[in-house]
Amino acid sequence: MNNLKKLDGKKIALIGGAGFIGHNLAVHLQSLGAKVNIIDGMQVNNLLSLVDNVDNLPYPDLSRAIINERTQILKTAKIHIRVQDARDYHALSRLLNEINPQIIIQLAAVSHANRSNKDPYSTFDHSFRTLENSLDWARSNISSLEQFIFFSSSMVYGNFKKNIVDENEVCDPLGIYGTLKYSGE
């Protein structure tokens, strides 16, 4: 818990942070006193992509309610959402220079396995290119950046051979998504 107290006042950039994990993480970090900025191109796995496709979802009314609730939660928490495609290195760099984060949390990815396998080029671009750009900025700003956190996935382990899996298990990534997460590690 002491490490969490050290987040008070820290500037944190969540790249690809408008999805399910990102918006929840942003709210929690903000509640711990961090100054959170979400950077997201709003193209996959996030609120805006849900809004654009809500009528095609199995439960459109429920989906609308979820979207409205997420939006209200972020608004109430006063979390800044910067709409920026992290695949654009120069634009991302300008935005990160403006924010000057002490911590970067890299969440950007196409996380839906079927979508990832259907369009591997786009998946690579949204998952790996964004990581490359974020790491390149981090390398250039190593004196001010305290931490770079990459969110991976259990997909790097493939089909679990036992109930509990930890970092000592052999990696056997599943599909494009799992392979790109493993490559990112």
What are these regions (language model features)?
Residues 1-185:
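N-terminal Rossmann-like NAD(P)+-binding domain of SDR-like oxidoreductases, especially those catalyzing
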